[in-house]
Structures are given as C-alpha cells and as structure tokens.
Amino acid sequence: MNKIISSFILLLIAVSVFGQSKIEYLEYDLKNGMHVILHEDHSAPVVTTAVMYHVGAKDENPERTGFAHFFEHLLFEGTENIPRGEWFTIVTSNGGSNNANTTDDRTYYYEVFPSNSVELGLWMESERLMHPIINQIGVDTQNEVVIEEKGLLVA
C-alpha cells in the first residue's frame, strides 16, 4: 500500500513539475552595467519595479553586524528629488505598495503600482540609486527603527 501511495505522490509531483509552462522573459545589460530581467504578466493590471543589489550581511565585519539592514532602511529617507518622509506618501497616493528586505547576500527593494505607473516606479528606484540623501537626522531615525525591529525579533 505504501508503494502505491508513494508512486502516486511521485506521479503528482512529476505532472506538476513537467506541466508548468515556461516563464518567458527578456534579459539584458544596460550600458551602465545594470542587469535587467523583464517579464510581462497580464493577469493583473499592476507593474512591479524591483531592484536587487548584491550586497548583504555577508559583506559586513562579523564583529559589527547590521549595517546592510540599516542601509536598507536609510535609503527610504529621501533623495535630492523626493523629500524626507515622502517616499511612502508618493507610493500610497499613487495606489501602490512597497517594501524591502536584506539577506546574507542581497538587498531587495520593490514597488507595486497600477500598470500605468511604470515610469514612476523606475524613477523612484533611480532616485534611490543615484540621488540618496544621507544625513544625521535620517541616520538617527533609522538607527532607532532598526534597534526597535531587532527588539521585536528577540522578544
């Protein structure tokens, strides 16, 4: 009986793996070196702009950790063209949502907007990359936020 059940489960796994259609995408490098993966999915009228940086906790001094996560937070503080505290306001007032996370080997930011706002998502991520403003008030604010988050994880 166990052989029959095991065989059936194996068959289901095989059917689900081989039955999946190939996800089509374009992949290329821009002149500035940025690697782009572009995928169209018309199942919902939204666009996601996602940027992944190949930097994370692995790049830190093991005796002083937390900087990658701290910088993830710091890059929401504002840019030359997005005033401090306005990042989330711009996203939500345009019907969007966003978030970020950091792992050992990467830092990932994304925005999801209605599909007619692809330019806004691209502009915001280019602002984060090219024109961030890092000042003492942002450092102090995000330091407190990260400390509070760490406390929540420990509790």
Spell out what each predicted region is.
Residues 11:
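Acidic, glycine-enriched active-site microenvironments
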Residues 53, 79-80, 86-155:
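Acidic/histidine-enriched segments that form metal/cofactor-coordinating
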Residues 5-7, 18-88, 110-113, 117-126:
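His/Glu-rich zincin catalytic helix
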